[in-house]
């Protein structure tokens, strides 16, 4: 519960001694000026002509709120429950790979921020630091492991088992990376963090992966990762087999079609992340927020729905929650914070997003996530959504 009458959620940013970018555009500008073009372009860009990247933003911008007033909104409640645990906010850290290319402490700094904020942290398969190192860095944080299926399936099962042994509490299987998206910005910059070794953490510490290499050279490792990180054969039988191999809840990340959401339930999946990979895989894809309502309708509350892709501020999170998401995952913004100020930068970015969310909930005329389900949203064409 947060008291919203003290008015300090915005003012604390005005009176702070060290100015920090307050919005996504300011963050992006500051990071562009700080880190090399290769890493910046990798993080900023989308696939192809970046239509999906634009679709994500336009999806949020097409929805407007019709607020209600003369309600007591002095105490805003933002807690949620996921898989039997209660969290003070509906915000999560989305899986973002290769954090070491923007900050030397990479995922270690990010997970410490998540621990401090009590927000679930989803670690990427292609992380700079191994999952065991991340677990040790933030022992009390809620940690989930994002899994890229491997061409050698035993590598995928090995990583899932390691995550379970290290205390991770869920497996997030990404389904939209059957091959690498058409990343034109990386070609322009001649930059591939995979080839530079920024994804080494989980692979070089995996016994099954290392045993599959012809030798222990850097070149052998890079080729091994490139051969295994994409999975064109991934199908529902693999999902069922993963379910048999782990005791952890399994979420599918990358679901955009309601029929796939229904199949996820049929196949025993425990949660869904509505996502288009931040616009980085297939160009021309529906914005994640535009995909959300039909998936909410298909799922009917049977399993949790989390949304990511294009969530840059608290108002974006509010709209996703109002349209039925149970939680919202943040990606690019926290990575920009990491690039600027390490752990402290991550905390500041996520806190600003959360503070804007709290203020916006109150200004919309309600006091809780549940209350957001009752507010009126309209599209820019004037059509009432709910």
Swiss-Prot record:
Its cofactor is FMN. Residues 16-382 form the FMN hydroxy acid dehydrogenase domain. PANTHER family: FMN-DEPENDENT ALPHA-HYDROXY ACID DEHYDROGENASE PB1A11.03 (PTHR10578:SF143), S -2-HYDROXY-ACID OXIDASE-RELATED (PTHR10578). Oxidase that catalyzes the oxidation of a broad range of 2-hydroxyacids in vitro, such as (S)-lactate, 2-hydroxyoctanoate, mandelate, 2-hydroxyoctadecanoate and (S)-2-hydroxyglutarate, to the corresponding 2-oxoacids, with a reduction of O2 to H2O2. May be involved in the utilization of L-lactate as an energy source for growth. Binds 1 FMN per subunit. FMN binds at residues 95-97, 124, 146, 174, 253, 275, 308-312, 332. It catalyses: a (2S)-2-hydroxycarboxylate + O2 = a 2-oxocarboxylate + H2O2; (S)-lactate + O2 = pyruvate + H2O2; 2-hydroxyoctanoate + O2 = 2-oxooctanoate + H2O2; mandelate + O2 = phenylglyoxylate + H2O2. This is L-lactate oxidase. GO terms for molecular function: (S)-2-hydroxy-acid oxidase activity; FMN binding. Homotetramer. The keyword Protein transport does not apply. The keyword Flavoprotein applies. Its EC number is 1.1.3.-, 1.1.3.15.
């Amino acid at each position: 519960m947060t008291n919203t009458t003290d008015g300090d959620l915005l003012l604390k940013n005005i009176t702070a001694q060290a100015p920090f970018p307050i919005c996504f555009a300011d963050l992006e500008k500051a990071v562009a000026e700080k880190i090399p073009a290769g890493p910046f372009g990798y993080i900023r860009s989308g696939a192809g002509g970046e239509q999906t990247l634009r679709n994500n933003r336009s999806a949020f911008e097409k929805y407007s709120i019709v607020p209600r007033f003369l309600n007591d909104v002095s105490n805003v409640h933002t807690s949620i429950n996921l898989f039997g645990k209660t969290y003070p906010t509906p915000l999560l850290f989305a899986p973002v790979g290769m954090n070491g290319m923007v900050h030397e402490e990479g995922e270690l700094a990010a997970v410490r921020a998540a621990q401090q904020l009590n927000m679930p942290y989803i670690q990427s398969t292609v992380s700079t630091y191994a999952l065991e190192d991340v677990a040790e860095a933030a022992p009390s944080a809620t940690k989930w492991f994002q899994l890229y299926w491997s061409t050698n399936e035993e590598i995928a099962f090995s990583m899932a088992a390691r995550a379970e042994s290290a205390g991770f509490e869920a497996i997030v299987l990404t389904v939209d990376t059957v091959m690498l998206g058409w990343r034109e910005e990386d070609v322009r910059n001649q930059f591939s963090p995979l080839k530079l070794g920024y994804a080494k953490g989980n692979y070089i510490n995996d016994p099954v992966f290392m045993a599959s290499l012809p030798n222990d050279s850097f070149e052998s490792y890079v080729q091994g990762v490139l051969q295994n990180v994409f999975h064109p054969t991934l199908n529902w039988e693999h999902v069922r087999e993963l379910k048999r191999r782990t005791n952890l809840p399994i979420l599918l990340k990358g679901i955009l079609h309601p029929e796939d959401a229904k199949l996820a339930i049929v196949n025993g999946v425990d949660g869904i992340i509505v996502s288009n990979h931040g616009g980085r895989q297939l160009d021309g894809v529906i914005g994640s927020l535009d995909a959300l309502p039909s998936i909410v309708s298909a799922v009917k509350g049977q399993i949790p729905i989390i949304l990511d892709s294009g969530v840059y501020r608290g108002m974006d999170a509010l709209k996703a929650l109002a349209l039925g998401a149970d939680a919202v995952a943040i990606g690019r913004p926290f990575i920009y914070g990491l690039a600027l100020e390490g752990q402290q930068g991550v905390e500041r970015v996520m806190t600003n997003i959360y503070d804007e969310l709290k203020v916006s909930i109150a200004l919309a005329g309600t006091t809780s996530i549940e209350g957001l389900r009752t507010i009126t949203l309209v599209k820019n064409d004037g059509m009432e959504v709910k």
